Curated annotation (Swiss-Prot):
Acidic residues bias spans: 363-389, 1186-1197
Known cofactor(s): Zn(2+)
A molecular function GO annotation: zinc ion binding
Protein name in UniProt: Cytosolic carboxypeptidase 1
Enzyme Commission numbers on file: 3.4.17.-, 3.4.17.24
InterPro entries attached to this UniProt entry: ARM-like, ARM-type_fold, CBPC1/4, Cytosolic_carboxypeptidase, Pepdidase_M14_N, Peptidase_M14
Species in which this protein is naturally found: Gallus gallus
Gene: AGTPBP1
Any matching Pfam family: Peptidase_M14
Length: 1224
């Protein structure tokens, strides 16, 4: 009975409302004299229902209801004051709840125009009806934010001054001026209105309303501050406020509220004052007035006092934003932003950044612009476009010309000219008649795969030298060599290396074997001597004698050192024979194979007779210390390096522990920014001493024991200048790429002289990208020499309090592509060292030098089975710096020299791989190392892969850039991966000849089945691929194209799909097959479009880690990168089997691959260039990369905190119209 009663009541209420609205509509139509009373009565009844029944509100604003039209029509036509008041009250009730939807309905029905006209009519009355004005402004304030054109409408109707005059005339009538101020705030969002109101004295008026702390009228104070903040965004109004001294007044008001609001009840008012200061400091005059009023110190002190209260974070963040904005722009402390190293180009480009740099007058200051801080441009509107194009314009980058998208195979060079590349394909003409080939597959060459320990190779004099003999054919090693056969028999399989535990278990066996293989090595003590001079590896009789008999100790003024006898063999150190010192002089760092004792420990060691032996663990089977030194001697660098970095000498093995993605501590960014601001406030605390400087040859290492020593004068090193800021804090400046004035990202340097238990802060202050994975859990890498000597030679992720943010160092327009007002960014991290006086190396990512590549290739060549593997290393060309660019050919030897086997050998499809076109993307080399080692392994699947394909591999397309520590360019100062369309043989020889190889294959009708260029990605996680597709590119545009133009073989998706199922680090959801205009000159697009390779890819490996799969939540290491290289090979084998239906049954999951549509096409329009929105979750602490955020909500963390999950895009939608996959 109760339910029935409620239902009856509801129906009656609904019918009652409809009846009243019908009566009101009839009154509007009749317009009979005397109907005013009826309208007054009906509207009063409706108002009562609306105030008492929520259901009535929903019914009147529901879709299909004409209630709003009827009420607005009545409001527009009636002249009865009470009816108008009733209707206004009804509308206020309707829009007071229900979010913004109801207000939007009112706007779409024309409510704004009616209200403004009513306001104009009411203003003509004298005096105006106060109640009417209150209701009108209250309603306008509620619907105004939903009407984007309300500012223009108000100005045209003349409503601006009506509201302003009401405030001026009723300053004591808080009930009236409160809604008027709310409307003025809405009006002020229009810049023209803000200027107009400013001319009429609105700024001065606001400062009459706001004032020091008071518990009275706090609502009015808050609204007045919000209105003032909006008005001051106008440069004209901001100047007016500065001229009248209001900046000092705002600071005084803020301090007063800060002191008295001890219970933090008025945080919004305090934030409102800060928003006004934030607006006025958008102009230079405002920033100057802020500094003159001691604003930096005031906000710094108040924000420090707010740190303890989490709810006051919006005040701290807004204060930080203002201080960063007002921090004086500093000049980067460099004489020029051009590289410290100079290389004269053989040909100067006709246009482009390099040409502009060469054409600059010698007296031009390229570090900072004279007008850097002179413009009054509103810095709030600055668009971040470093490195990538702004996302607002990314649609323009997608290629929409269907004719350009269609692959067009064209040689580009005469066939006669391309014949020069025939020499790089001897496998197509080799008859193998002189080889002892058996007709059956030989047994695996590795007979003792469980034996750990080092790999012994021929001496350096017997091994391959790229400079003297660039071409090596795999069959040159003869089976009759008994020493070589013995070496093969004891070599472990590449992919079957024993784990550390099994190595320990067989330590006795290892010792017995190694004592027969290795001479005594030089031992090292636990303590490292501070200031020990670097050891010169020169061919002197003294050195030869020491290294032949035992340990050598180098004396200096501070330390008394004596030779130490080795108590046992260092099992894992390669012999330092006399060949190490032949040829040019090469220096190691502060450690070599020497015994070193400090003065304090010397007496103890002598008296006790105890000697501590430090061992270097067994590293990669293709690493050899001696051979590395030999390779260094043939490497040519522009600075003519004579030192060798210890990580490259000792080698690296992955640490045995997992390295999770670092969880960012809350508030770390603002803490670092506060410390930066302290430099201005407490200038006397700043040391500001240069401790390392490539530009100043006379700048020697500091003598003080408490000062760190730095060095980067070794292969791939990059560190230009170091300035000590505080006792344990250093600013580091990176070197530009040679013949360039930017690309600051890669770093690799040495640090020594540290103490334990101290947190050292390092700030790399001239980074250029607007964001970094350092904000999302990535850590820099450190290599400890002491740890390496303690059998732990590993690069490990280190650092706490890591963040990446915009700093106060100006970036000149010359270095920013013509854009003025740009700033650099800072990577900051803190490290506490484990060992006193250690020598440590820091790097952006795992270093992999050109000399390391040469060593690895030579080791692979010397260790392979020539009867099983066809291996050839050639010199593709010579680089600008005089270094050889190696190209490697790998396949399986033919089963025999019979015609059928030779024919099968020659007709294997080609796979063309390349890597390291960008020197800073070292992870690409580690992936390539995994690929090479897998291809050269005795794994049965590797043998099957070799029998399936011929691999042409250019493992390092940019040797010069790698050697000289560049991040992106070669010695030409240009990004080589943007030169594939028209490479210059003089400036881009590696690209010119790599493209020539592919053009030659196209000319002889031997197109590679797959081309893949290995890269690294600094802005995204996981490993993924970029490919090329006409259909997917067009799907991302609004261009209508005939379906016949979009017909293409979807086989380009097969390999990425295979990798997503086989490689743990690979993520299909991050792959993209869109072709952009900005990428038309890259290898991927040119090889697809011009050469005609459908499966043309760029494989991107994260620098950070993974957020999916087996490695979710972990930072990526060399083990995972090498695994990816091996898994890529496995994917190629599966691809081959899929292309041969008789040989392999297709998995059902891959059969329908051609039916997949583009995922997330509505959101991602250019994913190869831009970071996806869902790539990273939001922080609990809002990350402010820029010092000039334009978001009014930037500090309101309480409203923004929430769990945010990245939307994993699924790759499984179907397209019924797509063609079936062509497996060929």
């Amino acid at each position: 009975m109760k339910v029935k009663k409620n239902l009856t009541c509801s129906v009656s209420t609904s019918s009652r409302t409809m009846s009243l609205l019908s009566q009101l509509e009839k009154i509007n139509l009749d317009s009979v004299l005397g109907e005013a009373d009826n309208a007054r009565y009906v509207t009063a009844k409706i108002l009562h229902l609306v105030q008492s029944q929520e259901k009535t509100k929903k019914e009147m604003t529901s879709k299909g209801s004409s209630a709003i039209e009827v009420i607005l029509s009545t409001l527009e036509n009636t002249r009865d004051p009470q009816t108008i008041l009733n209707i206004l009250s009804i509308l206020i009730e309707l829009v007071s709840v229900g979010g913004g939807r109801r207000a939007s309905v009112l706007v779409t029905k024309g409510g704004t125009q009616i209200l403004l006209q009513l306001l104009l009519n009411a203003s003509k009355e004298s005096p105006p009806n106060e109640e009417l004005m209150v209701l009108l402004h209250t309603l306008l304030a509620k619907i105004g934010p939903k009407d984007k054109k309300i500012g223009m409408k108000a100005r045209i109707n003349g409503a601006l001054n009506i509201s302003l005059n009401l405030v001026k005339q009723n300053l004591q009538n808080h009930r009236l001026i409160l809604p008027c101020l709310q409307v003025l705030r809405v009006y002020s969002t229009n810049s023209v209105n803000a200027v107009s109101l400013g001319k009429n004295g609105v700024v001065e008026l606001m400062f009459k309303i706001i004032g020091p702390f008071s518990k009275k009228n706090t609502s009015l104070m808050k609204v007045a501050l919000d209105t003032l903040a909006a008005l001051l965004k106008s440069k004209t109004n901001a100047r007016r406020a500065v001229d009248r001294g209001y900046v000092h007044m705002l600071l005084t008001i803020y301090v007063d509220w800060h002191r008295h609001d001890s219970r933090h009840r008025y945080m919004l008012i305090r934030k409102g004052v800060l928003q006004c200061i934030k607006s006025v400091t958008n102009i230079k005059l405002g920033r100057k007035a802020f500094i003159d009023a001691n604003g930096m110190k005031i906000l710094y002190n108040t924000s420090q006092e707010c740190l303890a209260v989490r709810t006051l974070d919006p005040l701290v963040n807004t204060s930080s934003l203002i201080m960063r904005k007002c921090f004086p722009k500093n000049r980067l402390p460099l004489p020029t932003i051009k590289s410290a190293f100079h290389f004269q180009l053989p040909v100067i480009p006709a246009s482009g950044p390099v040409a502009q740099m060469y054409n600059l007058p010698p007296d031009v200051d390229d570090v900072v612009d004279e007008s850097d801080d002179n413009d009054d441009a509103e810095t709030e509107s600055e668009i971040e476009t470093e490195d990538d194009k702004d996302q607002n314009f990314k649609n323009d980058d997608i290629e929409t010309d269907i004719n350009k998208l269609k692959p067009r195979q064209e040689l580009g060079r005469p066939l006669e000219e391309l014949k020069m590349y025939e020499q790089f394909f001897p496998e197509l003409t080799e008859n193998f008649q002189e080889c002892d080939l058996v007709s059956k597959e030989p047994k695996p060459f590795v007979s003792n795969a469980n034996l750990g320990g080092p790999i012994v190779v021929p001496t350096a004099g017997e091994e391959f030298s790229a400079e003297t003999n660039p071409s090596v054919i795999g069959i040159s090693l003869k089976e009759g060599n008994p020493l070589l056969t013995e070496e093969y028999n004891r070599r472990p399989a590449f992919l079957g290396l024993p784990k550390k535990d099994s190595i320990k278990a067989s330590s006795l066996l290892q010792q017995n074997v190694q004592r027969n293989l290795l001479p005594s090595c030089q031992c090292l003590s636990q303590e490292i001597v501070t200031g020990l001079d670097r050891i010169s590896l020169q061919n002197t009789s003294e050195n030869d004698q020491y290294y032949a008999t035992g340990c050598v100790i180098k004396k200096d003024n501070k330390t008394s050192l004596t030779p130490l006898a080795c108590s046992k063999t260092c099992e894992h150190v390669s012999p330092c024979g006399s060949s190490l010192f032949e040829g040019s002089s090469v220096h190691l760092g502060k450690f070599c194979c020497t015994g070193v004792e400090s003065e304090e420990e010397d007496s103890k060691s002598s008296s006790s007779g105890e000697q501590v032996v430090l061992e270097v663990s067994d590293v990669s089977p293709v690493h050899d210390c001696d051979l590395y030194i030999e390779m260094v001697k043939t490497t040519k660098s522009i600075p003519e390096y004579s030192e060798v970095a210890y990580p490259d000498y000792f080698g690296h093995i992955p640490p045995p522990f997992k390295e999770p993605i670092l969880e960012r501590p809350y508030g770390v960014q603002r803490t670092k920014i506060s410390q930066d601001i302290e430099r201005l406030i407490h200038q006397n605390d700043i040391i500001d001493r240069v401790v390392y400087d490539l530009d100043n040859s006379i700048c020697s290492a500091p003598e003080e024991v408490d000062v760190l020593k730095f060095n980067s004068k070794f292969e791939s090193g990059n560190l230009r200048k170091v300035i000590q800021i505080r006792k344990n804090e250093y600013d580091l400046i990176l070197n530009s790429d040679i013949n360039s004035n930017h690309y600051h990202q890669w770093f690799y340097f040495e640090v020594s002289g540290m103490k334990t238990g101290i947190g050292y802060r390092f700030n790399i202050i001239n980074c250029e990208k607007s964001n970094s994975q350092f904000n999302y859990g990535m850590q820099p890498l450190m290599y400890s020499v002491q740890e390496a000597l303690n059998s732990r030679p590993s690069w490990t992720r280190v650092g706490t309090d890591i963040c990446y943010y915009k700093n106060h160092f100006s970036r000149s327009s010359i270095a920013a592509g013509g854009q003025k007002g740009k700033s650099y960014y800072t990577i900051t991290f803190t490290v506490t060292f484990q060992h006193k006086d250690d020598v440590c190396y820091f790097a952006y990512h795992y270093p992999y030098t050109y000399s390391t590549l040469k060593m690895h290739l030579q080791k692979l060549e010397s260790m392979h089975n020539p009867q099983q593997i066809y291996f050839r290393q050639d010199a593709l060309c010579e680089t600008l710096g005089g270094n050889i660019c190696p190209i490697v050919t790998i396949t399986a030897m033919p089963e025999s020299n019979y015609y059928e086997h030779i024919c099968q050998f020659r007709n294997r499809p080609y796979i063309f791989l390349s890597a390291r076109v960008h020197p800073g993307e070292t992870n690409a080399s580690w992936v390539m190392k995994g690929t090479l080692e897998y291809l050269m392994s005795s794994n049965p699947s590797a043998q099957s892969l070799r029998e399936s394909y011929i691999f042409k591999i250019i493992p390092m397309l940019n040797p010069d850039g790698v050697i000289n520590g560049n991040h992106r360019c070669s010695l030409s100062g240009e990004d080589l991966n943007r030169q594939w369309q028209n490479p210059n043989p003089d400036l881009h020889p590696t690209i010119y000849h790599a493209k020539g190889l592919l053009q030659y294959l196209a000319a002889i009708k031997r197109l590679p089945l797959v081309y893949c260029d290995y890269h690294g990605h600094s802005r995204k996680k996981n490993v993924f691929m970029y490919g090329c597709s006409i259909k997917e590119t067009m799907w991302h545009t609004n261009v209508n194209t005939a379906s016949c133009d979009l017909m293409e073989d979807p086989g380009y998706r097969v390999l990425p799909k295979i990798l997503s199922q086989t490689a743990p680090a690979f993520c299909m959801g991050s792959c993209s097959f869109v072709v952009e205009k900005s990428k038309e000159s890259t290898a991927r697009v040119v090889v697809w479009r011009e050469i005609g390779v459908q499966r043309s890819y760029t494989m991107e490996s994260t620098l950070c880690g993974c957020d999916q799969g087996k490695y979710k939540g972990l930072q990526i290491g060399t083990k995972e990168l090498e695994e990816m290289g091996a898994k890529f090979c496995v994917g190629l084998l599966r691809l081959k089997r899929m292309a041969s239906p008789l040989e392999y049954n297709l998995p059902s999951g891959l059969l329908d691959i051609e039916n997949e549509l583009i995922e997330s096409s509505c959101k991602v329009t250019s994913p190869t260039t831009y970071v996806l929105d869902e790539d990273e979750p939001r922080f609990l602490e809002e990350v402010d990369y820029s010092a000039e955020s334009n978001d009014d909500q930037d500090a309101e963390l309480a409203d923004n905190v929430g769990d945010y999950e990245a939307n994993n895009q699924e790759d499984g939608l179907s397209d019924s119209d797509s063609t079936r996959i062509l497996l060929s």
